[in-house]
Structure formats: C-alpha cells, structure tokens
C-alpha cells in the first residue's frame, strides 16, 4: 500500500494507521480532545487571561442524527468563568474544523463551586481580623483550621446579590476526619469577587470544639473483629460481557455509557435483543439533579441545601475504585478524564466499575429453579462529607435498576453537653447531627420500541365499593389513565393505590394484542418538608412532584436549571412545564424524584453505614412471556 493510504483503502484495510478511528457520536471526550477544545477557544482570543474552565464535555449531537447513524462532527461544550469580571460564557468548539461555533455570555450565571473557590475563600477569611479574633476567643490556633466552602444558596439577603458568593465553614484540622471537629457558630458569608466578607456569624463561643476522635482507620476504630471466612469470586474464563467500540453487550442487553462531569454516570442507547433484533428501551438516562436540605434553622445551617450535581458536580468528584473493596474482585475498572480549571485534562483512575454478580433466584417453582446473574455499572462520588454510590443494575429478566448508596460522614454541629434542641440528634460527645433529606431526580428518556410515539399511562389499584360487584369485600380493579399534558403528568406516589407509571408504544403490540411498555416501579421515597413559600422550595420546584413528563427537548437536561448556584429558582422543570405542552403520542421524557429523610442516630457516627434506595424500570407487556425463561 502507498504510505498516503487513500480513504477508500483505509476503510478496507483496518491495519492502515494513518486514518484515526471515528469515535462514536456519544463517546466521551478524550484527553486529546479536551486539549484541542481548550486550544481552539484560547486561540480565538475570546478566553480572558486567568479565566477558568468550569466544564468541558461532549456536546451531544442531535438524537435523530445519532439514531440514523449519520456521521456527525465532534464538538465540545465548555463553560468558562472569569473571576475578575464575574462573567460566565458558554462555548462550542468544533473539534474537526478547529473553529468556535458559539461564544455567548450567560448573564447572572454562576458555575459550580470548585476547589479554586475553596482556596479563594480560605485566603479571604484568614486575612480578616474579625475571623482571627473569633478563633482566638475560642482558643483555636488559626494554623490548625481547615476552611470548607459551601454553596451559599439564595435567600435575598442584603449584599448577596452581586458577585460570586460562598459560605466559609471552619473545622479543627485534627486527623483525617476533620468533620468530627466543627467550630460551631462561626460562618463567613464571603464575596469571592470583591474579596470581602459580607457578613460574619459569630455565635457559640461558649460551645467547645469537639475533641473526640472521629478517625475511621485502625487503631482509632478499636480492635478488629474476627475476619469472615474467605469468599472468592472467580471467573476463570473472564467476564461474561463484551465491549465493542464502546458498546457493552451482556445477556441480550446492549448499552453505552459515559461519566459526565456534572451528572455522573450516563446511560445511552439501551436496548434488549429479542427475536433476532435489538429493541430500543432508553435513549439516555442519568441523574439530573440532587438536593440535600437541612432542617436546622440556625444561622450556621439554614443555608445548607446543596444541589450536589448542579452546584458541585458528581462526575468531577468521582473517586478511584479499588477492586475487592469498592467493587468485587472480578470487576473491570475504567478511567475517566475531565478538564481541570486550567483546561488541562485530569484523569481519575478506575473511576467506573463494571462487573457481574450473583443475582439470587431468577425464578422458581417446585423443583425447577434458575439462578440469576446481574451486571452492575458503578461509580462513587465523594461530595464533601458525604459519599454516594450509583449503580445501574441490568437484570436478565429485562429489568433495569438504579441503586443509590448513601454513606460517608454526616454534617455535624458542636453542642454543649446537657443541651438539646429538636432540629438535630446527639451522635457523640459534644456532637449532634441535624435532621436532613436527600433527593435524587433522574431524567429518563425512554424510547420504548422507538422514540415516536410513546405514551405515559398511570396505573392505580382501586378497591371496588361494597355491592353486587364486590359481594365479599375483597375485590379491586386496576385503573389506567393516559397522561395527556405536562400539567396532568405532575404526579406523586400513592401507597393506597400502589401507583405506578408505564411508558407504552401504542403502535407496537405484543403477542396478546396490547401495547408494549416499560413501567417505573418506585422504591423508598419522601416528600420535601420545606414550606411552600421557602426559598429552599422555590429553588427546588422540581421536587413539588415526584413524577413529571415532558416532550423530548435536547436542551432540557437539568431539573433545577442549567445554573442553580446562587439562583433564586424558577428554572428547569418548573419553567418548561409552564407551557403545559402536549405529551401524548410524543417522544417523551420521564422525570422521577426519590427522597430519603435522614434522622441521625448514634450508629451513623463516625461514618454512616450504607443506606440504599432506588427504583426499577421493568418490562410491562414488552415481551411475550418471562424473558428469563431461557436461562440455562
């Protein structure tokens, strides 16, 4: 072959290396692509000196082009923030053409709080005389203090309307778990733009700093118990899944995934092999937003209602997973790469795990039994004091499950011995953990047997009134109600009726003549306890309902809006659905919020045992019979 290798020959001879392989349109950006995107933007002369890259990620191409397998130029989406001017820009860089396709300032937008912000806040408070005096009054050496920057929220407070704002919270830096040593009643409301403290809370000088160890490693945890008997997980012939050009194939499932800097794990083009073809189920599924509101009204706590995805980022806070510890020994692990604030790629080794595990009994009757196997796609994000594990679990019976595992260190406050108040619970000497909630909102772009048309049906089990149709009092029926508009589709759970929702394709019938579908089966949940007129609820309006349905729009990704940091609310789902658009026989997106109310207990300290919650998407008339019937 000639060394120049014509394109036609390159398509025939896979060994020709002069033509790079074409990335799948949904493949995450590589380190080289991140570098190229940043270079394109900087070379355009638009990026101010010293500006930081808050986000650089794949600009996902139009869904219809991806599904048609059209060759699409690779583009990067970037968020650029200039600290000096307090300005935010969105940019699109065409990686193939080497040009800037978009550069737009976004007024009043504040990107997520980052490590750079913590460093700035730390420097500002340490140089403030009031802060120094407050520490001395508590007998605390400023050199032993660790400052953590919290997102400030929004409460229409004086002086907080302009600039980039955070709350600076101090801890005594004793050991690795400094969260066990809060310096109570000292919180600085910091304007990072002006370099000044807006307001300084200085109460609780009479509250001692907790000194009891909160360390999580030996010998602080005490003598270890007798180790359990060895349990080895072996796959002598290797894993049962294959990955071809970024697509995972396992037990009739097919899907792609990426680790997004903000959303964390994203599933793409999920389908199931049936009858010699791959039937589509989901186009895209990911966590859209998180919100963690605290119930303590005190000055050092009322503002703590973090939007962990939109204000901090989940993917960028992913941690490296250790096989045999964070995931089973038989797991395959994969790196993730993101852009640092300076635009240089940062690699997180072993950020994602993929593994098979025993799934218990798949089905059984009498002496006929089949054992199940699960495939788990997993990552863990450490967001400040809390750790969140996210598992997408693929079952052989066609069910897809999301499991969120909550662990880590609770946010605790210092209290004087012998005192008690109703907004927290004592967990250790001089320590109480305020009551709080965790909410997770997922965006599920279901394409059941295709994107168009889909319909969402609500199902309620209803008791039949006593009478001729219910002579013995035990009869109940199932009512199905199509949801036709966005307003009608703002729904909540109902235990009394075992409420569930099904996305069906009215144009595709199963063997029994019914539309094929997939149902959302909720798990543990809770209602937001913040008052209707509170800023907490105004900013998290997407939690007013546990289920929303919208017509598919590629730009409608984040339930709380694109920039929730310092936002007064009103964006995202609340804004989009105000139009009350029709959703029947459309390409629809199902939004589901689940919540956990955490009333702390001593057993949650100094580290919280895993508390898991989740939901399932299960086939509902999608197959002719139990799809796991063919298990060997």
Task: State the predicted function of each range.
Residues 84-85, 91-133, 191:
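Hydrophobic or amphipathic alpha-helical targeting/insertion segments
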Residues 2-14:
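Bacterial N-terminal signal peptides
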Residues 48-49, 86-88, 98-101, 132-133, ...:
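Short loop/beta submotifs within extracellular cysteine-rich repeat domains
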